[in-house]
């Protein structure tokens, strides 16, 4: 048999085949490298973007932190408000108050009596601009005039009509009171008090403060000008109470707090008196008496004492917070039927 001829590839053919094989095998590598570069660029771009976002976020947080109110100390607040000088004056006032308390609460005391001796009582008769006739009636019945008034003061009793100033300072109302006082010399004019119905509860603070600052007495008495007063009977009652420290004397009462707006005796802050809506025990406002120490307490703390709609309940609220001795004396109940009472409803 004849053998088949064998074809041996030439050298050039082997090179061509090798080149084709290498070209076909390198294409996937190039593609993979390309996608790797794309992925790297994508990741790098995201990282760069995240870095920029973090920078922006940090700037925002820094700005918001700078704008956030800082926690200030008391000294910082005082500096901001310019209150350093006020702080110093408060400390000085507290020191003066401590000194005043140690000296019996009184400073630069002026005596209302000609002899300078201590008085038994200062009686303040509440009056108003439209009460000229009432004052004349009171003078004609219970209040001495001229030399008799001076003799009464020598006995240790000072009695004055108590009135504030007009809302329109210096008007005809003020001038009439000044003229009446110049003629009668029986007024205690409260220069810092505005005489008005809605300010009546505050008037009692100004009265006790002015009375304490002008006269040194054992008792300070608030009286309405619409009652009949037995002056000698009142003096006898006071004589029997001499030496009773921190005495709060009057016709003690309590009663329902009126919560209906527009009603008589309406109390705007009725809710402060509890669910039962009942007033605490207090002396009726027609005639009430404070001993020297209690009147001094009102004088010293008048700037911070809370007032309610009426002066008698306001005083009663002040007495709750101190060691006051409550004395319920029926002779001071002006509407009672007792024969020895010292006042009665006019």
Swiss-Prot record:
Localization terms from the record: Golgi apparatus membrane
For activity, the cofactor(s) needed are: Mn(2+)
Gene Ontology CC: one annotated term? Golgi membrane
> Could you say which protein family the record assigns here?
Belongs to the glycosyltransferase 31 family.
Q: What is its EC number?
A: 2.4.1.-
Ranges per topology, Cytoplasmic: 1-28
User: What are the GO BP annotations of this UniProt entry?
Assistant: arabinogalactan protein metabolic process; protein O-linked glycosylation via hydroxyproline
Q: In which pathway does it act?
A: Protein modification; protein glycosylation
User: How does this chain sit within the bilayer?
Assistant: Single-pass type II membrane protein
Ranges of compositional bias, category Polar residues: 1-10
Effects seen without this gene: Reduced levels of arabinogalactan proteins.
**Single GO MF descriptor:** hydroxyproline O-galactosyltransferase activity
What PANTHER family does this protein's entry cite?
Answer: BETA-1,3-N-ACETYLGLUCOSAMINYLTRANSFERASE, HYDROXYPROLINE O-GALACTOSYLTRANSFERASE HPGT3
Tissues/organs with expression: Expressed in roots, rosette leaves, cauline leaves, stems, flowers and siliques.
Source superkingdom: Eukaryota
The record places the following residue ranges in the Lumenal compartment, namely 46-346
Output the Pfam families linked to this UniProt entry: DUF4094, Galactosyl_T
Q: Which UniProt keywords apply?
A: Glycosyltransferase, Golgi apparatus, Manganese, Membrane, Signal-anchor, Transferase, Transmembrane, Transmembrane helix
Q: Where is this region: Disordered?
A: 1-21
Give TM regions: 29-45
Q: What name goes with this protein?
A: Hydroxyproline O-galactosyltransferase HPGT3
Q: Which organism is it from?
A: Arabidopsis thaliana (Mouse-ear cress)
Q: What does this protein do?
A: Possesses hydroxyproline O-galactosyltransferase activity. Transfers galactose from UDP-galactose to hydroxyproline residues in the arabinogalactan proteins (AGPs). Is specific for AGPs containing non-contiguous peptidyl hydroxyproline residues. The addition of galactose onto the peptidyl hydroxyproline residues in AGP core proteins represents the first committed step in arabinogalactan polysaccharide addition. AGP glycans play essential roles in both vegetative and reproductive plant growth.
Q: Output the Gene3D superfamilies linked to this UniProt entry.
A: 3.90.550.50
């Amino acid at each position: 048999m004849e053998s088949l001829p064998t074809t041996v590839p030439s050298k050039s053919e082997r090179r061509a085949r090798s080149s084709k094989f290498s070209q076909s095998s390198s294409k996937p590598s190039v593609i993979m490298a390309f996608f790797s570069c794309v992925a790297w660029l994508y990741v790098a771009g995201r990282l760069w973007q995240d870095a920029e976002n973090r920078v922006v976020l940090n700037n925002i947080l820094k700005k918001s932190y700078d704008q956030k109110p800082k926690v200030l100390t008391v000294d910082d607040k005082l500096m901001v408000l310019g209150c350093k000088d006020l702080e110093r004056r408060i400390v000085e006032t507290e020191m003066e108050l401590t000194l005043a308390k140690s000296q019996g609460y009184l400073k630069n005391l002026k005596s209302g009596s000609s002899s300078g001796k201590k008085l038994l009582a200062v009686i303040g008769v509440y009056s108003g601009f439209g009460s000229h006739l009432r004052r004349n009636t009171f003078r004609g019945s219970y209040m001495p005039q001229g030399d008799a008034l001076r003799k009464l003061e020598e006995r240790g009793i000072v009695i004055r009509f108590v009135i504030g100033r007009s809302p329109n300072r210096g008007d005809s109302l003020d001038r009439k009171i000044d003229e009446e006082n110049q003629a009668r010399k029986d007024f205690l004019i409260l220069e810092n008090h505005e005489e008005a119905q809605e300010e009546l509860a505050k008037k009692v603070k100004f009265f006790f403060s002015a009375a304490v600052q002008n006269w040194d007495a054992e008792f300070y008495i608030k009286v309405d000008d619409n009652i009949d007063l037995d002056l000698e009977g009142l003096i006898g009652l006071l004589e029997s109470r001499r030496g009773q420290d921190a005495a709060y004397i009057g016709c003690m009462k309590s009663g329902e707090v009126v919560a209906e707006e527009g009603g008589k005796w309406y109390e705007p802050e009725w809710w402060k008196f509890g669910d039962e809506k009942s007033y605490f025990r207090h002396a009726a406002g027609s005639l009430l008496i404070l001993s020297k120490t209690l009147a001094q307490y009102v004088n010293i703390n008048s700037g911070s004492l809370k007032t309610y709609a009426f002066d008698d309940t306001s005083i009663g609220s002040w007495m709750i917070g101190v060691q006051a001795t409550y004395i319920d004396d029926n002779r001071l109940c002006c509407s009672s039927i007792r024969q020895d009472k010292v006042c009665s409803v006019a």
